[in-house]
Regions:
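Conserved, mostly hydrophobic/aromatic
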Residues: 21, 73, 129
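P-loop/Walker A phosphate-binding loop and immediately adjacent motor/lid segment at beta-alpha junctions
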Residues: 81-89, 139-170
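Short glycine-rich, flexible loops that bind phosphorylated cofactors or substrates
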Residues: 76, 137-138
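N-terminal [4Fe-4S]-dependent radical SAM core
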Residues: 1-22, 35-41, 165-166, 170
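Short pre-active-site segment immediately N-terminal to redox-active cysteine/selenocysteine motifs
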Residues: 25-29
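Conserved Radical SAM active-site core
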Residues: 2-3, 17, 35-117, 121-122
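Non-cysteine beta-strand/loop elements that form the S-adenosyl-L-methionine
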Residues: 127-135
Length: 170
C-alpha cells in the first residue's frame, strides 16, 4: 500500500485531536472529490515500518484521541489497513479508529466488495465509520465530519451489537 500523508494534530477528521493516514488508491472517483490526487494506487510513497512508527509515536501522546484512515479509500487497501488497525487496537486499546470510505456500511457488512475478504473483521476494528461516496449535488458545508448529506457518521460498535445502523453523536 502507498500513502500520501500522515497528518498530525488534526481536529477536522474525527473527534478530538487525531493522527490521519491518507492512503493511496480509490475506486470511487467521486466528482469534485477533495483528494483526487489520492485516487491512483501507485501514487504517494510506500507504507513502511518508518511510517508505522511515525503513527505509533503520535498515538502514544496522551492528548491524541486516535487515528483516522482516509484517502483514497482505506477499504480499497483492505489487507494493509486491516493489519495496521489490528496492531493499533492491540498497542493502543484506548485510542479510537475512525475510517472514511466511499462504500456504505451495508456493502462492507455484506462483504460484497471483493469476495473472500473478511470485511466484518475490518468493521470490528473501526469505532466510527463515515460512509458513502461524496455527492457534489448533496454537498452541505454545515455537516460535521462529512461533505455530503448522503454520508453517515456511524457508531460501528453499537451498530454491530444492535444489528442496525446507529449514528454516532457528538
Amino acid at each position: 500500500m502507498n500513502y500520501h500523508n500522515i497528518t498530525k494534530d488534526d481536529m477536522n477528521n474525527g473527534d478530538g485531536v487525531r493522527v490521519v493516514l491518507w492512503v493511496s488508491g480509490c475506486s470511487h472517483h467521486c466528482p469534485e472529490c477533495q483528494n483526487p490526487q489520492t485516487w491512483c494506487f501507485d501514487s504517494g510513497i510506500p507504507f513502511d515500518d518508518k511510517a508505522k512508527e511515525e503513527i505509533f509515536t503520535e498515538l502514544s501522546k496522551d492528548y491524541v484521541s486516535g487515528i483516522t484512515f482516509s484517502g483514497g479509500d482505506p477499504v480499497d487497501n483492505f489487507l494493509t489497513v486491516f493489519l495496521l488497525m489490528k496492531e493499533i487496537k492491540e498497542k493502543f486499546p484506548d485510542k479510537t479508529i475512525w475510517c472514511y470510505t466511499g462504500y456504505t456500511y451495508e456493502q462492507i457488512l455484506s462483504c460484497s466488495i471483493k469476495k473472500g475478504l473478511n470485511y466484518l473483521g475490518l468493521l470490528k476494528m473501526i469505532d466510527v465509520l463515515v460512509d458513502g461516496e461524496y455527492k457534489k449535488d448533496l454537498r452541505d458545508l454545515d455537516l460535521k465530519w462529512r461533505g455530503s448529506s448522503n454520508q453517515r457518521v456511524i457508531d460501528v460498535k453499537k451498530s454491530l451489537a444492535e444489528n442496525k445502523v446507529v449514528l454516532w453523536c457528538d
